[in-house]
Amino acid sequence: MSDADRLITPEKRGEDIDTTLRPQSLDDFTGQAEARANLKVFIEAAKNRGEALDHVLFVGPPGLGKTTLAQIMAKELGVNFKSTSGPVIAKAGDLAALLTNLEERDVLFIDEIHRLNPAVEEILYPAMEDFQLDLIIGEGPAARSVKIDLSKFTLVAATTRLGLLTTPLRDRFGIPVRLAFYTVDELELIVRRGARLMGLNMTDGGAREIARRARGTPRIAGRLLRRVRDFAEVARAEAVTREIADEALTRLLVDNMGLDQLDMRYLTMIAVNFGGGPVGIETIAAGLSEPRDAIEDIIEPYMIQQGFIQRTPRGRILTATAWKHLGLQPPKDLEAAQFRLTLEDD
């Protein structure tokens, strides 16, 4: 099973694009309290000065609301919102077309900016810093440089991998914002709101059960809510109770920690095949037949946040929490081995 086929992948799928469930303001947005509070200040200050907001960089795992926050920012600034992604901007001309069509103080959102073509990135530097495009027209001896003035705009970019951004690009963002996984309480509020907008009767236990298995990710919470609704409707249930949510998600092979078959294969392979580790990421990728990027960006962030694995210079190792979840007996010297690897990491 590839990551794209998983119910709990945080990557965007067509069914996730339901604008009616998205919050429309920062006050309506649940979670990320510190980031929201700071963004409110920056937005209000920019509006009071009548200036474009400084460029913003959102950093964090997929599905935490980076696109939604960018849309809300444009709405609260009272400006137009245009959206694209790094892989889509293949040539300098593609970027030039986007930038020259922006009006004063507009917001341009670029998702996956770490996947931007290096040649395009070079064009972006003067656009962000001086609001100018410096293009080369023609070829050979007839080539000439043309400068095009741009409207003062705000670039809002998102990345799941800050380390892949070049230093010159990273330094041009005046407002870096790191987004964290959501708590179960925050996700419960999100599930309740989604159920209310769907006209779905939801008990406290039902909302809590869905939130517990959503891997700290609102996008996954919304997807699980829709699937649980299907089970509840077919069962002609008057409300989504904890029992109905538990039965539905168990049948969908999402366990009580939000792990699915691929997650369990990941943990089991390290435990059984490699004695709990350490094992390198390339070996894990080969064993799972999954791309390295998918493992590092999709599977491991939640595993680390939940304390299932540790990353060390020698590879991944399972923690006592992971062994307990698998129902397997950990090695007798597990704590000592982990301590030694931690010292090596330092």
UniProtKB/Swiss-Prot annotation:
Documented EC number(s): 3.6.4.-
Database matches in InterPro entries: AAA+_ATPase, AAA_lid_4, CbxX/CfxQ, DNA_helicase_Holl-junc_RuvB, P-loop_NTPase, RuvB-like_N, RuvB_C, WH-like_DNA-bd_sf
Catalytic activity: ATP + H2O = ADP + phosphate + H(+)
Subcellular location: Cytoplasm
Chain intervals for the UniProt region annotation (Large ATPase domain (RuvB-L)): 1-182
UniProt enzyme class: hydrolase
Official protein name in the record: Holliday junction branch migration complex subunit RuvB
Coiled coil: none
Disordered: annotated span: 1-23
UniProt remark on domains: Has 3 domains, the large (RuvB-L) and small ATPase (RuvB-S) domains and the C-terminal head (RuvB-H) domain. The head domain binds DNA, while the ATPase domains jointly bind ATP, ADP or are empty depending on the state of the subunit in the translocation cycle. During a single DNA translocation step the structure of each domain remains the same, but their relative positions change.
Entry superkingdom: Bacteria
Chief location: cytoplasm
